[in-house]
Amino acid sequence: GDETMTTILQLSDLHIGPHNDEKDQKTYDLIHHMMTHYQPDITVLTGDQIWSEGVIDSGRVYKKLMEYLNRYDTQIATTFGNHDTEGHLKRSDLRAIEDQYSTNYVQKNHSLIVDDKEAYTIEVVNNDTVTHVLYVIDGGDYNPFGIGDYDFIRPEHVNWLRETHQAYQTRFQHNFQHNLLFTHIPLQEYREVENIGEYHGIFNEPIACSKINSGLFSQMLLNGDIEGMFCGHDHDNDFTINLYGIRLSFGRVGGYNTYGDLQRGARLIELQPDAIYKSKVLEFDDRF
């Protein structure tokens, strides 16, 4: 393929359960298909990798997933959703499992952990030059005040986005324009789909964002380097809208052991230096 092309596979909402049943096996089949057919350079798991509520040994399930992913020639990156740490394990426990058992985990840069939620960057390199920065932010799980259902990105992480962008500007003396951001829970701004009316893809359920808007989108606009954002969480959405020059996308639900009417799949993102990224939804033909 193209030497300067970097491909990213977004796997979201795999929802692997503790019983290794037929549904989970299909999820593993989907992962295998996507890895072997598309051979992504980087694979980003955008949350709800596992079920954990009432699961005694969710750590074993997560370890199995990490070990399974070791067989592929890709770099693994993760963030967490609202279902990964509802049991005994904290996010720090899941990160420890990644550290211990994942042999192809991506190099994290500029890591900042706030309330056990991590933000970090991935540096995409072409010909010894960093051409893109991928920002990964853990948006948490449930609202700490019981306001609505879901958590919001912490102000410290919004500030981190500003400072980290500044650090890259200073380090490279270069204006990045094609960077991306990954998180689990959609921002409130995704709701603009209802006002814009113009979108690509499927919009089949209300946007399950936080009731609190902590201003991440305003910082994305101010930085001016982020061209696209990707989340998961809403299994019946996979649309993209262009909001004030930033494309906001859902992935495609990948897990069989969970709700949702969409054909299971993933999202493929293609990066090239000095070009707008390309992205498409991939479906897994699971009829056989």
Task: Kindly label every feature range from the protein language model.
Residues 13, 31, 43, 48, ...:
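Divalent metal-coordination and catalytic microenvironments
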Residues 1-65, 70:
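N-terminal active-site segment of His-dependent metallophosphoesterases
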Residues 61-174, 267-272:
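Extended active-site neighborhood of metal-dependent phosphoesterases/phosphodiesterases
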Residues 38-42, 133-136, 148-238:
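His/acidic metal-ligating clusters that form di-metal
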Residues 6-18, 131-141, 182, 247-253:
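Active-site-proximal beta-strand elements of phosphoester/diester hydrolases
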Residues 19-23, 47-67, 85-104, 193, ...:
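Metal-dependent catalytic neighborhoods of phosphoester/phosphodiester hydrolases
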Residues 121-128, 216-223, 235-288:
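Binuclear metal-dependent phosphoesterase catalytic core
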Residues 17-20, 51-54, 78-90, 142-145, ...:
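Active-site environment of divalent metal-dependent phosphoester hydrolases
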